[in-house]
């Protein structure tokens, strides 16, 4: 799908039985705020927060872009329409005083955005995803890239407006050529289930997730964090 918002809408209309979405968008959908102000969604519950999704802002290494402020007047992909990445990107740009009139924002999926950054058709792209994001690592192996950090003032404003966001550090050497750690923010990716699923199915799935989290880690490219504390962190909606 196009991402978090699409998954939430599909769940609420019973087109799908399960989906993953960013915690901030789940809260907006449940409360009828943000992009869901006129289309409050219901009909689903959270199973567990699975892993943190880090906001990664990627630019070419020799672009001369060294901070979010430098994105003024630049072509920037903010993720697909109705995606969690789009919401996060818009919030961060706005908190840095960069409205869509000051930045040429474009809606590309990650693969397209990476290709256009490499070819010089765009100047930067946002990617909100679990580490180590495959498309970014593949890009890093093909051309020199770097990441923009999010300032303390921006992260504090974001976390004040949305308690689903937390400070996050991308460790050095997470990606090829990335020798310094990156200060950013992260939001939990939460597994949702339709209310139409039986309690037995949901309970069995939840039990399987927690009992086999170590085994599941080998089959996914993200750092699963499944324990009783992290599973409910950053999401205030019903489980």
Feature annotation, model-predicted:
Residues 24-25, 83, 151-154:
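Short, acidic/turn-prone active-site loops that include or flank metal/cofactor-
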Residues 5-8, 12, 26, 44, ...:
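Extracytoplasmic/secreted envelope proteins and their assembly/folding machinery
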Residues 1-73, 77-80:
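Short, glycine-/small- and polar/acidic-enriched structural segments
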Residues 2, 80, 126, 195-196:
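Conserved residues at beta->alpha junctions
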Residues 12-16, 31, 76, 94-98, ...:
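Sec-exported extracytoplasmic/periplasmic mature domains
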Residues 34, 63, 100-187:
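Pocket-lining segment of extracytoplasmic ligand-binding domains
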Residues 174-239:
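Segments of small-molecule ligand-sensing domains
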Residues 1, 52-119:
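Bilobed "Venus flytrap"/periplasmic-binding protein-like clamshell domains
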